[in-house]
Amino acid sequence: MDWDLNAAGAWDLAELERDHAAAAPSSGGHAANAAAAGTGTESRPPAPGAAGAPAECSVDLKLGGMGECEPGAARREREAAAGAAKRPRPAGPGGQQQQQQCPSCAVDGCRADLGKCRDYHRRHKVCEAHSKTPVVVVAGREMRFCQQCSRFHLLAEFDADKRSCRKRLDGHNRRRRKPQPDTMASASFIASQQGTRFSPFAHPRLEASWPPGVMKTEESPYHITHQIPLGSSSSSRQQHFVALGAATPAYAKEGRRFPFLQEGEISFATGVVLEPPAAAPACQPLLRTGAPSESSGAGGSKMFSDQGLARVLDSDCALSLLSAPANSSGIDVSRMVRPTEHVPMAQQPVVPGLQFGSASWFPRPQASTGGSFVPSCPAAVEGEQQLNAVLGPNDSEVSMNYGGMFHVGGGSGGGEGSSDGGTSSSMPFSWQ
């Protein structure tokens, strides 16, 4: 199908020219159309079939008329009518906008300008003066401003001289105060102290396996308890305490008396046996005895018997325990010193026979003129451990009962006190 482009273009241009020429003489009709458009009504051109009506333009988009055909006076009138329809809202003195910018104080009769106050006071509608006043009138009731709640409360909800209400203060204190721990009683705290360390118990506990009168303390890791039943003349058994470890010569220098001895007391300065007190104390503390030796440097230990004690043994030997090797020690009593003359007493035996359990460890020597015997022991070699001698009051046999065991080995010298065949022997003792 062929199109005649020239004929079609000529027809369109001719139609437009005819419409423009017909619209020019009818300017009054266009003014009426412009006034109708200003009032909101749409002007429609007359139908093309009507007599004397111009034909509608085909390029019109029907947006209110053709702009180029509208005169200037009609446009101004339309703009003035549209501006008169938009009237601004009048803002009175008590308008909402003004109230949001400058709120007034909630206290009755207050005319303070909150515009000059801080944002806190403007937000809560209270002036700075009334926020700290003890009593204010709000809505006819006496109230007070709470600085924690930032609200007005009745006076009954406040404590005396408090700026916050009682309810808010209770929650504030619970959040910020920690619970206080229970205070310890000073008396029980001091009573539980033992030495340089503290014990959770006010008094040492007694165990069922301990003998009567024996007490265990933290200061006594080497607390040894043994019983020495004497012969027929002995009336009771005495518990003796031996403390090993670092020797402390303070007792010997100061000459202290130890009241734990039930049948007699000994002063370490003079070595004199004192009379026993009327009532022996129930608690027998730990005793650290022995002065360092001048020759060997080992800490000495002492054992005390009950009746007729007239001599104090000053021996520079140490008690051999489980830690000592079995083949490096022997039993030896190097010397016995008379407390008054301080002379060696090895020539005067005082113990007729020393028995441990039922076996005799030392043969009984011949009795001397004094009627006393001493156990025969070999001379100590270098590195040997020595045992303290135990003094007896009479010629009867003295036996020592122990609860544990410790070994005494035969030295290289092989004296009478060593066991047969060079094997180690066991000596029972109590280790608490």
From Swiss-Prot:
Keyword Protease included in the entry's annotation: no
Annotated zinc fingers (SBP-type), start-end: 102-179
Which residues are involved in binding Zn(2+) 2?
146, 149, 153, 165
**Which cellular component, as a GO term, is one annotated location?**
nucleus
Under the heading InterPro entries, the entry gives: SBP-like, SBP_dom, SBP_sf
Give yes or no: UniProt keyword Zinc-finger: yes
Which GO terms fall under molecular function for this chain's record? DNA binding; zinc ion binding
Biased composition of type Gly residues is found at: 409-420
Feature: compositional bias, Low complexity: 22-41
- Chain segments carrying region Disordered: 20-55, 68-102, 409-432
- The entry marks the following residues as binding Zn(2+) 1, namely 105, 110, 127, 130
Domain of life per record: Eukaryota
Tissue range of expression? Strongly expressed in immature ears and weakly in husks. Found in the inflorescence meristem of the developing ear, in the spikelet pair primordia, the glume primordia, the cupule forming region and other floral organs. Not detected in other tissues.
Task: State whether it acts alone or in a complex, and with which partners, per the record.
Answer: Monomer and homodimer.
What the protein does comes down to:
SBP transcriptional regulator probably involved in the domestication of maize. Acts as a transcriptional repressor binding to a 5'-GTAC-3' motif. May repress the growth of lateral branches in length and numbers.
Give the note.
A single Lys to Asn substitution at position 6 is the probable cause of the transition from the hardened fruitcase surrounding the kernels in teosinte to the cob that bears naked grains in maize. This substitution is not affecting the DNA binding site specificity, but increases the stability of the homodimers.
| Entry protein name | Teosinte glume architecture 1
What organism is listed for this UniProt entry? Zea mays (Maize)
Which gene is transcribed and translated to give this protein?
TGA1
